[in-house]
């Protein structure tokens, strides 16, 4: 992720061009022509990782369908990395559904919005996730309920993890995913440099 004012400007221009073109293409090919959803979904995120200069190294093989991906959360960049490599639908906090532009992209990506602070909605929100899994789709969940600098995994706060206990008979697959930002500009990342990309 090399930085310079000129490179930042170029990336901004590419971002402005890429987002409307790719999102419009995704809408047209999937919702109009009924083509494969995740092909264009992942293409959108891969374009973003390329624009931002993010190189991803993957260890292990992700499940293809009907899986609950349980992941640590460090940065908004996590979304790009996971979205470009997993056939999964994100679970996001309900506030994001009110963010201009971002909310439209999330809805296009079938994001499941949840209110983590409303205990009375937990049952309905668990059903939303289980319905997706029952259809053979996979879901990406950040059970820590917040982000960190990535030095450790925070205690799980998400009551949505109860879906595993309550739906034992469904035999859902659970795959843990760990994200680590190991290099910045090609150099190993020390703890003091993590605020460059971590949101906590």
Regions found by a protein language model. Give the residues of each.
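Soluble extracytoplasmic domains of inner/organellar membrane proteins
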Residues: 122, 129-130, 137-141, 145-156
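Short, Lys/Arg-rich, polar N-terminal cytosolic tail immediately upstream
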Residues: 1-3
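Alpha-helical bilayer-embedded segments of polytopic membrane proteins, i.e.
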Residues: 7-22
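Catalytic core of membrane glycerolipid acyltransferases/transacylases, capturing the structured
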Residues: 19-34, 38, 49-51, 67-120
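A cross-family acyltransferase "interaction/gating" segment
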Residues: 103, 151-200
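Generic beta-sheet signal
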Residues: 65-71, 88, 137-141, 172
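A short, well-structured juxtamembrane/interface segment
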Residues: 43-67
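Short amphipathic alpha-helix with an adjacent loop that forms part of the alpha/beta core around
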Residues: 60-63, 128-133
């Amino acid at each position: 992720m090399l930085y310079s004012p000129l490179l930042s400007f170029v990336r901004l221009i590419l971002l402005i061009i890429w987002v409307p073109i790719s999102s419009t293409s995704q809408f047209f090919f999937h919702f109009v022509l009924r083509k494969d959803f995740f092909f264009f979904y992942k293409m959108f995120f891969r374009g973003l990782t390329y624009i931002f200069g993010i190189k991803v190294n993957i260890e292990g093989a992700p499940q293809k369908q009907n899986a609950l991906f349980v992941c640590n959360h460090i940065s908004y960049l996590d979304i790009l990395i996971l979205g470009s490599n997993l056939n999964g639908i994100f679970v996001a906090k309900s506030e994001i559904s009110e963010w201009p532009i971002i909310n439209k992209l999330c809805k296009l990506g079938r994001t499941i919005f949840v209110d983590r602070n409303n205990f009375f909605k937990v049952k309905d929100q668990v059903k939303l996730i289980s319905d997706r899994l029952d259809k053979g789709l996979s879901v990406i969940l950040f059970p820590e309920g917040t982000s960190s600098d990535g030095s450790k995994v925070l205690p799980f706060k998400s009551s949505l993890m109860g879906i595993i206990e309550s739906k034992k008979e469904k035999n859902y697959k659970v795959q843990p995913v760990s994200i680590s930002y190991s290099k910045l500009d090609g150099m190993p990342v020390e703890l003091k440099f993590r605020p460059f990309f971590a949101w906590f």
